[in-house]
């Protein structure tokens, strides 16, 4: 059972969205979201084509650098941002649009603020907000950023409302939600849980979560390739021998076990969600002798398993080979980058497909090397999500 959180209250102005309490509203809305995402193409060839096209646009921009020092983040953000924007709002953006960049700037400032110890304490003691001035008005600044991003979501919804023909099949989450609202209204039904606030909060969450986590993991992939050139060579060889120059498809995972092992090791090392959402026990329970009463706030940290030496030998070492047995990739249930249970990430299917198709396409076409003689360190920044610090590389075309 989830406990209502102050951060989400600040974002939504109430208990809206897809990540709140264990009640009928959340169950209904998650079911609607999963059904909608499936209907608009999660797992479809069309969506995979869109991801592959985005990857090729990134490669084309990188190759223009002609081996000069570049930050890989900008073009990855454009590609992922366009995909998630289209899924959320049904609006196709050009690769060089500035909407994604505006979102990124505000979100980049908001995420570390949302993950500060101050916000953790605010979840447990809401009156702390009145003492915000003692901590540099960080809560106030976070609220300002959330309001700005929220207003941008509002404008995006308006664009969708103006362009979407209700007689057509929805192509996005917001279009499907608008159609459901109209259906209830036309039938003379109460709006129930299909309110504007619910749509806005859910669209906000789908966009923010789908953008930040995928970008962070893809950047970490590039950083690990640069720091481990022997791993990069093995992936090059595997793709050259088993795929050649034809386009990468998601179904190629069965042909590329080492590439899959590399990605699973990135998920383990990256732990993109280091601190999960606050939960609440629904009944008295006991864990290793510790009694936990019903209604107690708990904060499960699944990522601790990823770095546990009792689970993984020498966990500080990046070693894709730990996920290979008899030349086959072995999926490890202990590695949970998208959380677990009924409230695991709604976009996990898309995220895993994005990661595989994009990284395999990047490595098929590019070779990544250090910007300087010393490889960039693998260092993280922390917030609601965890991401590697800024770094630069040199990118060389393989063909």
Predicted features and spans:
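Conserved cytochrome P450 catalytic core segment spanning the I/J/K helices
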Residues: 38-42, 67, 116-121, 141-218, ...
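Cytochrome P450 heme-thiolate "Cys pocket" and heme-binding signature region
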Residues: 14, 204, 209, 288, ...
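Conserved cytochrome P450 K-helix/beta-meander segment immediately N-terminal to the heme-binding cysteine loop
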Residues: 300-327
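Cytochrome P450
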Residues: 41-53, 63-86, 94-103, 127-151, ...
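Cytochrome P450 substrate-recognition site 1
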Residues: 1-47, 71, 76, 80-83, ...
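Conserved cytochrome P450 K-helix E-x-x-R motif and the immediately C-terminal K′/meander segment
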Residues: 151, 155, 245-288, 309
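Cytochrome P450 heme-binding "Cys pocket" and the immediately downstream C-terminal segment
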Residues: 229-232, 331, 349-385
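Central I-helix of cytochrome P450 enzymes
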Residues: 80, 84, 145-154, 184-238, ...
């Amino acid at each position: 059972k989830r406990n209502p959180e102050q951060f989400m209250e600040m974002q939504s102005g109430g208990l809206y969205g897809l990540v709140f309490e264990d009640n009928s509203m959340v169950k209904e809305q998650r079911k609607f979201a999963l059904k909608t995402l499936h209907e608009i193409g999660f797992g479809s060839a069309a969506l995979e084509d869109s991801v592959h096209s985005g990857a090729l646009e990134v490669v084309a921009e990188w190759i223009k650098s002609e081996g000069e020092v570049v930050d890989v983040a900008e073009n990855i953000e454009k590609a992922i941002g366009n995909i998630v924007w289209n899924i959320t709002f049904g609006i196709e953006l050009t690769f060089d649009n500035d909407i994604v960049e505006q979102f990124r700037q505000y979100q980049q400032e908001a995420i570390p603020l949302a993950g500060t110890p101050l916000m953790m304490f605010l979840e447990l003691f809401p009156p702390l907000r009145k003492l915000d001035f003692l901590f540099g008005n960080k809560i106030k600044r976070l609220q300002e950023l959330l309001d700005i991003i929220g207003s941008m979501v509002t404008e995006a919804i308006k664009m969708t409302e103006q362009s979407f023909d209700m007689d057509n099949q929805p192509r996005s989450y917001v279009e499907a939600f608008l159609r459901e609202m109209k259906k209830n209204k036309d039938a003379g039904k109460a709006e129930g849980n299909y309110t504007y606030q619910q749509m806005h909060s859910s669209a906000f969450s789908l966009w923010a979560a789908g953008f930040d986590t995928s970008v962070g993991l893809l950047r970490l992939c590039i950083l690990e390739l640069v720091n481990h050139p022997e791993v990069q060579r093995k992936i090059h060889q595997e793709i050259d021998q088993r795929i050649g120059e034809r386009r990468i498809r998601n179904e190629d995972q069965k042909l590329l076990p080492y590439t899959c092992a590399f990605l699973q090791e990135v998920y383990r090392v990256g732990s993109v969600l280091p601190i999960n959402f606050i939960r609440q026990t629904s009944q008295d329970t006991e864990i290793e002798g510790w009694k936990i009463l019903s209604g107690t706030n708990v904060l499960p940290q699944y990522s601790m398993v990823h770095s546990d030496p009792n689970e993984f030998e020498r966990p500080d070492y990046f070693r894709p080979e730990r996920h290979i047995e008899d030349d086959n990739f072995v999926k490890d249930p202990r590695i949970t980058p998208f959380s677990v249970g009924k409230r695991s990430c709604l976009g996990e299917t898309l995220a895993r497909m994005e990661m595989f198709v994009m990284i395999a396409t990047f490595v098929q076409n590019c070779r990544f090397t250090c910007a300087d003689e010393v490889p960039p360190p693998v260092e993280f920044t922390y917030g609601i999500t965890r991401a590697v610090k800024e770094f630069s590389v040199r990118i060389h075309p393989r063909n």
